[in-house]
Each structure stands twice: as structure tokens, then as C-alpha cells.
């Protein structure tokens, strides 16, 4: 926060504190103390920077209110009084919905209209509960430029800018596939991105001078593809057409975003629901040296026998063998594979004493070299995230203004496809095995003429970034030249993707084509089970799937390797 306030000119400072997992954590906090439920980190940061923001005239907008935006607004007022820094505080509420049976939290994803109303009423600080990440930008932009709710193109441009900003340094070189091309000193501490937004919704992504990191079309493309799905990026304010986005260099560490078209938002709002799924425990057995497969089979049978003899057996048992071992290894660690046991049950006894008892029993009676990475534990509760949808008109969004007045915020106008932009259509990909949804596409390049190829990692020619949405994973893959794009769009089909990533198995995979970005976006449904909080697999948020894909070896035309 201090870096952004002191690094250069700024009108509005935004803060995104709410990942899907965060609301589950805040829900558990609120069970212990109903006065909690908001991100306390925001208050700690604000204590150091409130006076600075006031002095520089910077408005602050953050979704740190979590499950208790009114409580956070009160806490900010108390902080303001204690520091003797007078500020006008407002908050947005109405996202909290009646809880379905067994749910811990249920929150609709609101748009930026409530934020805009608070700013129009003179708020210096606006805190919200669950809003879309992009709403932290669309709200201030709509206030600043006095946009109406049907100025879809401008709002869509702000949505795209907000999506680029939402994950901070991921737009300035953080977690970037081609990081080795940058000077190491620039990556030690990447600066945060900022957006210069114009009245027509176009923007320039940049960063404060002198901060670390890099902003170029590659870093912005990577973030644009992160945690998205098709060409239509639907939100509560507008549906942004990602297939219309154009990125152009605008000087050092500056990328211009233009051409974004918008449509009316869908008639429903997304609702994030979290609940305690039950109890979970995990034991990781270390298998060192020879006969790894046989050792794994022995311990599986021994644990199954122990469970069969126990009074209560875990309802869900899964095993995963990771062959991290190497032959003739020079260190013990390199000679070892890991066998991961995960159990789940509604009864803590079934995942606690039963599992720890089985593991202890094996300590002197199992495979040679038996040991585990950590002592068996009692287990712990785990969370589950799911998404639902509710009619937008049924959600009563309210802006609580600095005066205390409550302003009802109507739902944005809903409707059909925006005039001037046709409906999504299937591109002509008859030559490739792909299910693809894209909109008003420019012609795809012809198939690259056959010629000599070389077996190289896919990442030699393309970048990738992956992320999670509930139990799904998206993998965005992009080319950096027209020639590579012409090869990529025809070569990396859904069938190819499945072959490269066997873990995908029989799951549904959808491929989306974004020609303006020279990019493909693959969505794998259900790869993460019930979401990050359930920790269903290694890499529970799917962050490394893109880099795994890049590491896979494919035949690439020699002409593209440079």
C-alpha cells in the first residue's frame, strides 16, 4: 500500500483480499467471533498509510469487508479517530444471501455500481464484501467518468483492466513463463501494476517508475488468460468480449488495451458457497531405493487391512504415488519416492485415531526403510467451494454512504446480445479435433505447411498460465509471433492436450480460441475436485498445470525455433 501511494500519481487505490478460500477462512473466524469476518490485514496496512492517503487525496476501495463489511467500516472509523485522520467511510452490502442447508457462507458476486455510488457521495474509503475482482475498477471508473449502466464498451474496457490488475505482480512479470528473459534484479521484487483508464474505456497498464518487474504485451496477455474461460467474460455490470481485446506496446513498461466490446450482463449473478465438507487427514510414506512399486503395494494392503479391522473406516480413501526417485541417486532424497494417503470422512474419529493408529502400527512391520514425512495427526476439517446462480433482481445491493444513508442499487440492465456484435460462433476448425467457442473471429491462419520438425518442450515456443475456478482449471496458452500462432491453433487441439496431460483422463475439456491475443484457453472441468479448500490433488489450485504443459515434448517446425 505504501509503495503505491508514494511511487507516483494515483487517484484510486484498489485492494483485492478475497480469494475463494479466503471466505471459508473468514466464515470460520466469524463462527468464533461474530464481530470478525473481515480481512484484518487491511486494517494493519491502513494504520500505516491512512494519513498518507488522506494527504495525497487518494481514494481507497477494497473488498476486505469479506463477510462483515459494516464491521470493517466501523473499524476503519475507529482507526481514523484514533489516528486523528478524518476520512469519510462508506461500505457496500447485500452480497450475503440466505445460507443453503449445511453452508458456511453464501455470497453473490456484486458489480461496481455500489462502489460508484459511495464515491459519488464523497467517500474517501469504500469497503465491500464479495464483489467481482473487476468491480474494484469498474466502480471507480464509472464514478470518475459518470458512465451510465448501459455504456457497455466503456465498462467492458474497465473490466479487462480490472482483470489485469486483480492479481498484482502477475501482470508485471511475476509467475511469468518467460521470466528467464528478464534481468534477475527486475524480478526480485516486482512492482504492482496500475491502469490509466480513459473515458472510452481504453486503458494503459503500467507501473510506478523505479519499481521492479516488467510490463509488456506478454505479461499482460498471461494475466488476461488467468482464471478465465470463453470469449465472453460475464460479470454483474457487463459481459466483456475477450476476443475483441487488442494489446499494443505504448512505451517502456506500458501496454495499451483497446478495442474491447461489451454486451449486457447475464440475468443472473454468480453465488459462491462454502461449507465444511468433513474431516481430512494425510500421511506421506517415503519409499527409498529399490522395489518402489512393490513397497507401495505392500503399504496399501497393510493400511486397507488396518482400516478393515477398525471400528470405523474412512469413507473416502485415495492414494497417489509420485515417482520422485532416481536410479543410482547420489543423495537419499533423490533416491526416494512419495506415496500419499488422503482420507476424508464426516466423523473426525475415522480420519484421526484410525489413520494415526494404522501408521504407527506399520512403523516396525512394513517395507524396508519405512518412514513418513511427518508424524500422523488428528486430522482437520476441510472446506468445499461450489458455485450457484441467482436472479440478479433478487439481490438487494445497498450502498451505505458516509452520512449513514442507505442507497438501494438496482441491478444493471439485463438483455440479449449487444447491437453491432454478433453472437458467439464456432470457428471453422474442421481440420482439428477441438470443441471451441469464440466470437466474431478474424480468419484463422492456414495450416502450417509440413516440413522438418524437432522434438522440443512446448514451452520453447509458447507461454502458459493456469489457475482455478472452483473445481475447474483453466490453462491459457499463447504465442508470441504470428508464425507460432499459425502452428499452435492447429497443433494443440483438445486431443493433443489430453495426450500431453494424461491426468486429464476422461474429464470434460473445452478449448476456446482468442485470435487477437494469439491464444488458446483450455478449461478442464473437475480436475480439482471440490475446489482448493478440499485439497483433492497435488497442486490443489492448478497453478503449475500450465508449466507442466510447457514441459511436455512435442514436434515443432524447425522454422519456428529461431
Q: What is each of the regions a protein language model found here?
A:
Residues 507-562:
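Helix-rich interaction surfaces within compact, conserved domain-sized segments
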Residues 82-94, 138-179, 490:
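Catalytic or ion-translocation cores adjacent to nucleophile or general acid/base/metal-coordination motifs
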Residues 18-36, 54-56, 95-102:
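Gly-rich Lys/Arg/Thr-decorated short loops/hinges at beta-loop-alpha junctions or inter-strand turns
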Residues 63-66, 123-140, 463-483:
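Conserved phosphate/anionic-ligand binding catalytic regions in large, soluble enzymes, centered on
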Residues 160-259:
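A conserved active-site cap/scaffold subdomain adjacent to cofactor or substrate pockets
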Residues 9, 259-429, 439-445, 455, ...:
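C-terminal non-catalytic interaction/assembly regions of soluble proteins
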Residues 96-128:
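An acidic, phosphate/nucleotide-engaging active-site surface
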Residues 8-26, 48:
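N-terminal glycine-rich anion-binding loops that anchor highly charged ligand groups
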